[in-house]
Every structure is written in C-alpha cells, then in structure tokens.
C-alpha cells in the first residue's frame, strides 16, 4: 500500500486492527458531529499565498517550555496505545525522540511510566486525569517525577465519560463485549499474534502498579467510570500545582474565560481541546474555539491545540490561528497501528514536508513568522 498521508495510515490501521480497537481510535461522542467538524472547519481555512519571497533558509524549529522541538508538534496522550502495536507507547516515544518532538504518555497506557521513560532518548510528558482516587493521582505524580518526566498535562474535560455510541456497537462496551472482541481478534491474525500474544502483558501499567494487581480492559472501563470526579474545581487542583515544579498544562479548554481562569490558577500552558470530539457532541471545533482563546491569554501562557489535525498544512493553519504547537492524537495512533515506530516516524516526516511546502508558498521561513496574516479572511 502506498502511504502518502495520514488518511492512508487510517485506512491501513482499519485493515490491521480488530474493529473494537479501530473504532475506539476513530470514533467520537454521540453522532460525531463535533468530531467531523474538527477536520472540516480546519479544512475551510484559507492560507494567503505569497510569491517571489526569499524562503531559502526555512526552519521548523521552535521552543516550548524551554524545550527545543524540531517541529511544532507533540504526540498527544492516547489511551490503550499498547493495544495498537506491541508495547505501543514505547515505540511511539522512540519515534518522537528520533524526530525531535515530545511524546506525552496517557494515564491509561498499557506500558507504565517507568518502562516508557527508560526507553526514550528524550524526556517524556505525562497526562493525568482528575480522579476521585487522590492517592492514585499522587502516586502517579511521584512516579512521573522519579522517572524524569518534564511536563505534566492535566486533562480536565472528563468529569464524566462521553457517550460514545460507536463503542457499544463495536464491542468496546455493550452486551457480550468480551465475546465480540474475541471473535474480532480471530479475524485479524497478524494483530492477534504480534500484539495480542507477543505484546503481553496487557495491563494498564500505571493503574496496575498502584492497585498491585493485573488490570485488563473491563477493569479499565470499570475503574475509570467509578473514578471520574464531577465535583472537581480549580481549588481541588491547588495541591497539584504546589507539588509539580515543572511545566503544568491544562488540557480541555474551549472557552476564553476558562483560559483566563487557567492563567489565574498558575498554569504554564493550556490545550484548546474538545477531546477529539469524544466527550460532548455539539461543542465548537477547536479551529473555531482557538482564535478568541489565543487573543485572550496568548500573552500570558503557552497555547497548544489538538483535534482534527491530519496534515502539516493543518498544523500551519492552527499556528496561524494562534497556537504555539499542535498535539497529534488520532493521526499518530493510525500510523502506529499500521507500522509501529517506523509508521510514526514516517508520519512525522510527512507532516514536516507538508509544513515546509505550506510555509514556502505562504512566504514564511520560521515558525515565529506564522500568524494571522498568513490567513485569508481570518483574524485580520
């Protein structure tokens, strides 16, 4: 199969993965309107082409929280990554390090913090949910700190799980889910051997180490469902801000006032995110939410963005809308599922090439030069 874009990796991942896993990556909440809008709204943003400008010395490098990045991209935290490829979190972290960008490990990863951090040539980031079990949160923070994690990403848009209808149909949840997953795995023998058999253990590494016992998919669903905390407020996070001395990012911001509250709280950065359209259907796409948020707080903290980003062209669009860098979730998960570490490295090469073309044809030579003037009819 010819691979030239993230959409090609999506098709390859769909062929390789059992349906329940592919739909878990690919699906969103409710009827998935917001999930689709994330990509479609971004695609409608027009860049301003410029000609006869010297763009010979072009660079994708940038700096985020004092860390130099070879391009303004971070691999986003994605749950169960170790089920898409054998020890998938390790492979993704290695790919990111080789390409000079950060990798962020999910709370609900298969591989534990210690395994991933020890095998990455670059310090990793760690994502943490706000959960009722504060003991787990403290344990995870202490382990992350001991493993050399540099940056903490706090996901705050999950006080309750989103209604993901596709998961019920695919076997991730719903009646006879375990039996349906087993039958699906039997139809994908390559995945069943490489990941299902050779990728063991399939524990949720960060959780099982805390609980002191193996944790499997049903444990993941049940434990998380019982631990989401709808009572959480900014005040409940104060102890974490005091404990964590490195950069702390609040992920899940869609409203300018919430962004201002993050500044008051003392966050170093935010991620403008609707969780890839996986939480509340009907909210703004991140392409539409980003500009007013960047205008409100862009001078006070680092603004990052995710959701709907499928190309280097999309990265340039998001930077022009006000982001400092972009997080890649689904795109990197597709590439990992399709071809492991090599797939992720190739995807990042594709993004870099697409960015270079976009920058060349819009007449900019550095990431810092990309701003609202790079766009037609947006934020001018």
From Swiss-Prot:
This protein's name: L-lactate dehydrogenase
Self-association and partners: Homotetramer.
Domain of life: Bacteria
Role according to the record: Catalyzes the conversion of L-lactate to pyruvate. Is coupled to the respiratory chain.
Domain (FMN hydroxy acid dehydrogenase): residue spans on this chain: 1-380
Gene3D superfamilies associated with the record: Aldolase class I
Active site: 275 (proton acceptor)
UniProt: substrate binding residues: 24, 129, 164, 278
Similarity comment: Belongs to the FMN-dependent alpha-hydroxy acid dehydrogenase family.
Phylogenetic classification of the source organism: Bacteria, Pseudomonadati, Pseudomonadota, Gammaproteobacteria, Pseudomonadales
InterPro entries: Aldolase_TIM, Alpha-hydoxy_acid_DH_FMN, FMN-dep_DH, FMN_HAD, FMN_hydac_DH_AS, LldD
Keywords: Cell inner membrane, Cell membrane, Flavoprotein, FMN, Membrane, Oxidoreductase
GO cellular component entries: plasma membrane
